[in-house]
Amino acid sequence: MCSRGVGRTTEQGIRIGRAGERERIRGRVRAVIGQLEGILRDLKEVAKELKEVVEQIDRLTSDFEFELDTDDWTPGTVSSTSSSEKGGPLCDLGPLDFLSSDSWEFCSFLEASTPSDSGDGSDRPPDFRLLNGGVTPNGPDSSSEEIPIAQQKPPPSKNSGSRDRVRFSDKVLYHALCCDDSEDPPYGQETPRDPPRATAPCAVMKSKPGGLTGVRKGTRNCSTQTVCDKSTQTVLPYVPKKGKDKL
């Protein structure tokens, strides 16, 4: 019996604890709801104050006239009104109704609408003498103070008939006979050209009783000669030994 009574009391205590927790949660929720209601009331009061401020601004600005004529419109007013109205219809602006402040068409319109500075209205062409670096005026009374143009002197012309003589010296002849590339000939002197080589006659080679074996160009074996010797000496015809004995 005692155990049953103890079990009942514990169950009742648990129920009471759960009920207390629920009451606490409900109290917190009610408090939050009350705070939200207070915030909504404050917002409503702020909205009323804003309406009153707007009405006062309308009363103060009712005496001002903000309507402008079409001639007074500028690109700034056009852009401001278009941004404020968010794409609303604009009034008739004449030639500016299709232009914007950042378009090339507006720039061309301004260039076409600007009047010319000259009184007669005729466009004077630019002075090409100033552009090409000609005589530059130095003020309003600079007719006498003009910068002279530097005249270019023509280069001295040489006579076609006259020709410099080439004087040959021992040094030039030495260079003609011996190749020495370390030293260049002096300025104004020309090295003599190689004399034309004599054409060597063709020697006919005879063979045993059979006839001609072939035609051979007679040249002298000059394997020990230098390049300069070959260029300066004439080529001697080749004569076989039999021919030398007969001579």
Swiss-Prot record:
A GO cellular component entry from the record: postsynaptic density
Coiled coil: 30-65
Region span, Disordered: 69-90, 112-166, 180-217
Name the record gives this protein: Inhibitory synaptic factor 1
Keyword tags: Coiled coil, Synapse
PANTHER family: INHIBITORY SYNAPTIC FACTOR 1, PTHR15917
One Gene Ontology biological process: inhibitory postsynaptic potential
Ranges of biased composition (kind: Polar residues): 76-85
Function: May be a component of the protein machinery at the inhibitory synapses, probably acting as a scaffold.
The family this protein is said to belong to: Belongs to the INSYN1 family.
Gene that encodes the chain: insy1
UniProt lineage: Eukaryota, Metazoa, Chordata, Craniata, Vertebrata
Originating species: Xenopus laevis
Localization of this protein: Postsynaptic density
